[in-house]
Amino acid sequence: MKKLEVFGAAKLKGQIRISGSKNASLPILAATLLSNKKISLANLPRVKDIETMILLLKSLGSIIEDNKKELIIKNTKQTKTFAAYSLVKTMRAGILVLGPLLAKFGKAKVSLPGGCAIGTRPVDIHLQALSKLGVKYKIIQGYVHANAPKGLIGANIKFPKVSVGATENLIIAACLAKGKTTLSNCAIEPEIKDLVNFLINMGCNIKWTAKRTVRIEGVNNLKELDYSVMPDRIEAGTYLIAAALTEGNLKITGIDPKIISTEINILKKVGSKITLKKNEILIQGSKKIKNINIKTSPYPGFPTDLQAQMMVLLCKANKRSHIKEEIFENRFMHVAELNRMGAKISINGNQASIEGNIKFEAAELMATDLRASVSLILAALAAKGKSVINRIYHLDRGYEDIEKKLKKVGAKIKRIN
């Protein structure tokens, strides 16, 4: 099994270009199932979850050509509606093929999803909303068996709580439904806006009518499309935190600062000096890190996908900080490993109390999920000596060329068997 060796105490300095967004690419790839026309996608990150989604599309009959610069997808012979557990088990985004399969064929058998073990992530919201479009479903032996005998029919749907995945699935499904669908209490993450932009460019009729309300009118014909996926704001936030943690000096390029304004404002509050330019962020980490209290929440709030990384930074703050996790109920599994490195973090329900002024100690560590794995890399970068991180297959699900990018800005990091 592969591991990472990280030698700490280096100040990161240089430039990092941000890759395409994993969380935008996955629903866009699923949405290509709606069309029989050629679709070309550029700026896809080369990470494991994307590879898995490509394999899933191929298993459904998509013909896919990869020339490394772009992915060319044709669904002219795509007739299969069965998404197997063997492909869906490693990523929760597998459930996103349910909506387009039902929209196109009126039936689907899709395995319940896997991914990081950071909460139950129920698909009930997806299924209850799809039922309002005319879908009948049963869950049998870990599979969703769904069909729409009369096809999908537009409806007014209010999500009981904000859900990124359910918003994506329903927007995609409604694009081919009969009549109009109005979805309210939608998630409004930039990745969802990117999905909607992709769908509109493909010929779908979608309009935001309020901050969290979207109206979709079903269409019969879609167009060929060349599309470039947005940059990854979570990757950008991770490297900004790495700079703040190591007193580094980084230029982050290829991303609009507006989409991570919440994260930028928090980093300014803890002491980092940040300069914003068009598609560039310059950050200078401070020797003195100020404490702060944070809670995760749906966009435009602080993202749960940066909670673990931010926790590492707050271990170096001048006083105690608190983080309240309000998205997932089991997202503090990195705490035990950070405490083994000298952190003093205590958990009470969904709140973490983080003592400041910590000096991290190098250690052998075990990653538990995607974002936890990168938080351990950050802690190792701030520690003296050599740390070894096990189970880095989690990392490969979501970060493109992370060792290469970190090496380029001065980190001592290498992959070993």
Swiss-Prot record:
Q: What does the record give as EC number?
A: 2.5.1.7
Which residues are annotated as modified residue 2-(S-cysteinyl)pyruvic acid O-phosphothioketal in the UniProt record?
Answer: C116
Q: Quote a single Gene Ontology cellular component term.
A: cytoplasm
Give start-end of the signal peptide: none
Q: Name one Pfam family in it.
A: EPSP_synthase
Report the protein's function: Cell wall formation. Adds enolpyruvyl to UDP-N-acetylglucosamine.
Q: What is this protein called?
A: UDP-N-acetylglucosamine 1-carboxyvinyltransferase
Q: What is the lineage of its organism?
A: Bacteria, Pseudomonadati, Pseudomonadota, Alphaproteobacteria, Candidatus Pelagibacterales
Q: What gene is this protein a product of?
A: murA
